């Protein structure tokens, strides 16, 4: 990159994944977060803009603090990349912060931690107000058992049992630093903090935890499932509705703001 001409910017954005067919641009022109964002950025930059994201999300998966970087020759003030871009974005996406960063900053490769929350409604009837906002099960769940199982995720492990068949990660070995499971007002929250995640990993974990909570899988069975390192014996992938990317960790020197998780979530 010619640093004399180009600037590198990092932006933090939030989006409603139910409105888009995932993050990545697609050849058939269906609405995606990346396509909408790059179109809006181009309006402000006056030139084509290509973005690099911290972590791609699937159809239906949300983000409260996704991080993206892009290069541009356009000299614009910081607010142009926030308010200006937001004026050109469709409903369901908003830029929260923008910051000019060092030319070597990389949204994906410089990230050393990622945070996800899965919001699950446990109720006999699914609330129409939570559709697309939370996963749902009609089953009564034993939160204590689920919490014990979730604790087994912490540490560096081979998570092949929770890996999608189409996952392109070079290694299934990842490190989970924190796995907290709580419940309030009929909503279960699974918070995971790890160095990186496999494709569908969080949704597959939630699917297995629901099996534990409903008595279809014991805590010991959950532990054995991890050790099996095979997707073949694992419970089905859970729905995307309740999955949120809630933060990305970067070295402090880059000054990337990680917003707090919204209180409503």
UniProtKB/Swiss-Prot annotation:
Top EC category: isomerase
GO molecular function, one term: tRNA pseudouridine(38-40) synthase activity
InterPro entries: PsdUridine_synth_cat_dom_sf, PsdUridine_synth_TruA, PsdUridine_synth_TruA_a/b_dom, PsdUridine_synth_TruA_C, TruA/RsuA/RluB/E/F_N
Chemical reaction(s) catalysed: uridine(38/39/40) in tRNA = pseudouridine(38/39/40) in tRNA
Disulfide bonds: none
Entry keyword tRNA processing: yes
Record's keyword annotation contains Isomerase: yes
Residue sites binding substrate per the record: 116
EC number: 5.4.99.12
Keyword set, alphabetical order: Isomerase, tRNA processing
SUPFAM superfamilies reported for this sequence: Pseudouridine synthase
Pfam name, any one: PseudoU_synth_1
Active site positions, chain numbering: 58 (nucleophile)
GO biological process: tRNA pseudouridine synthesis
Sequence similarity: Belongs to the tRNA pseudouridine synthase TruA family.
Described function: Formation of pseudouridine at positions 38, 39 and 40 in the anticodon stem and loop of transfer RNAs.
Subunit structure and binding partners: Homodimer.
Record-linked HAMAP family: TruA
Protein name: tRNA pseudouridine synthase A
Organism: Neisseria meningitidis serogroup B (strain ATCC BAA-335 / MC58)
The organism's taxonomic lineage, starting at the top: Bacteria, Pseudomonadati, Pseudomonadota, Betaproteobacteria, Neisseriales
Gene: truA
